């Protein structure tokens, strides 16, 4: 039996087509992926992201515990601020990438990938020491994302909270949004400005409908996982299971900014990640643009002069560029912009070149 979010019953009303996404029955699209993608780039889109996991970490030793688990410097946070980070294994491979919200003194909300909830919880509990409480709140919290250049104007119609004053990665807790309480943060996974709204599961349907109504005049439409994927891909935001895995480090995946290897506290993977940060990693995530016809898909092998140099992690026809492009993890010596490589597509070698990323920047 596939898991469902609190908004499942609304999908059909908006024409949602569902798929199995890591054990969840979620909408891949409502209208078309291209239309939804373009709405987010030019106006606004509304996503149900309630499958994501939310875990509260509290207690007097919560900061030292998080510093040991996270690659970023959690001590830099203050209440009302969020941070993007990764958790790594001792060998530098990635457990997960996540957001940490500091809600108060010794109170943090961790937002983790849906497919990793059980694994992440087990990893955290295994390494918890001292006064640390780990509370999985995933079933009680729903998550909606309003993304796009019109997101701010839309939300201003629904809340008295000063959403326009929020800087990226800042949030307002216990904000009133159309009569319901929610945490509103200026974060997202699309490469656009936008907000993520964490509310009680019971309030999700009410808030969804209010956002749809308020957004109608601005061109907001409901969006599915398909557009979420093409949007994050163009912005070179990694997806766990593709750009980040047990065998790929945050440095290799291009999120070295979330690795503070000089922070005082020791953390899992520190020696490997420090070495990669100081001297460069052997592999690098690069952009590929096809020279010849074909789309570079996840898992396709990349060659140079007949030698395998890596694999495509994500690829598609970019709705914004109208070109067939991909992200690929390849040997660093073949990662220079302009380098010509071959992608194996249906047993044929097809020419591509290494290009600048991200493919899209607002």
Curated annotation (Swiss-Prot):
Any one GO MF annotation of this record: aminomethyltransferase activity
One Pfam family it belongs to: GCV_T
Taxonomic superkingdom: Bacteria
Listed EC numbers: 2.1.2.10
Enzyme class: transferase
GO cellular component assignments: cytosol; glycine cleavage complex
Catalytic activity entry: N(6)-[(R)-S(8)-aminomethyldihydrolipoyl]-L-lysyl-[protein] + (6S)-5,6,7,8-tetrahydrofolate = N(6)-[(R)-dihydrolipoyl]-L-lysyl-[protein] + (6R)-5,10-methylene-5,6,7,8-tetrahydrofolate + NH4(+)
Coiled-coil regions listed: none
Gene Ontology process terms (BP): glycine decarboxylation via glycine cleavage system
Keyword terms: Aminotransferase, Transferase
Keyword flag Transferase: yes
Family classification: Belongs to the GcvT family.
Known function: The glycine cleavage system catalyzes the degradation of glycine.
Subunit structure: The glycine cleavage system is composed of four proteins: P, T, L and H.
NCBIfam families, per the entry: gcvT, PRK00389.1
Name assigned to this protein: Aminomethyltransferase
Classification lineage: Bacteria, Bacillati, Bacillota, Bacilli, Bacillales
Record gene name: gcvT
């Amino acid at each position: 039996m596939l898991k469902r979010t609190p908004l499942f019953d609304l999908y059909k009303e908006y024409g949602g087509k569902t798929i199995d996404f890591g054990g969840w029955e979620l909408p891949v699209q409502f209208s078309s992926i291209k239309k939804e993608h373009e709405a987010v780039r030019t106006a606004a889109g509304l996503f149900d992201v309630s499958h994501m996991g939310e875990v509260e970490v509290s207690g007097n030793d919560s900061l030292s515990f998080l510093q040991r688990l996270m690659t970023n410097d959690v001590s830099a946070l203050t209440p009302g601020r969020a941070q993007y980070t990764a958790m790594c294994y001792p060998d530098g491979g990635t457990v997960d990438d996540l957001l940490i919200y500091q809600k108060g003194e010794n109170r943090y909300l961790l937002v983790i990938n849906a497919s990793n909830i059980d694994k992440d919880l087990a990893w955290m509990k295994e390494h918890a020491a001292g006064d640390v409480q780990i509370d999985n709140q995933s079933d009680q919290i729903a998550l909606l994302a309003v993304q796009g250049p019109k997101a701010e104007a839309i939300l201003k119609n629904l809340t008295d909270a000063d959403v326009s004053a929020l800087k990226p990665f800042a949030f307002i807790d216990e904000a009133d949004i159309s009569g319901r309480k929610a945490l509103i943060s200026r974060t997202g996974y699309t490469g656009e400005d936008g907000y993520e709204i964490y509310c009680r599961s019971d309030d999700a349907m009410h808030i969804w409908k209010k956002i749809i109504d308020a957004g109608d005049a601005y061109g907001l439409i409901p969006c599915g996982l398909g557009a979420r994927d093409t949007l994050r891909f163009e912005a070179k935001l990694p997806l766990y299971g593709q750009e980040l895995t047990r065998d790929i480090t945050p440095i290799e995946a291009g999120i070295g900014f979330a690795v503070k290897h000089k922070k005082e506290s020791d953390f899992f993977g520190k020696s490997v990640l420090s070495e990669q940060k100081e001297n460069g990693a052997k592999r690098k995530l690069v952009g590929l643009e096809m020279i010849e016809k074909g789309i570079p898909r996840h898992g396709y092998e990349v060659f140079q002069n007949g030698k395998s140099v890596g694999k495509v992690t994500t690829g598609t026809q970019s709705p914004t560029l109208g070109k067939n492009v991909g992200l690929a993890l390849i040997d660093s010596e073949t990662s220079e912009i302009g380098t010509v490589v071959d992608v194996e597509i249906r047993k044929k070698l097809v020419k591509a070149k290494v290009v600048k990323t991200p493919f899209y920047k607002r």
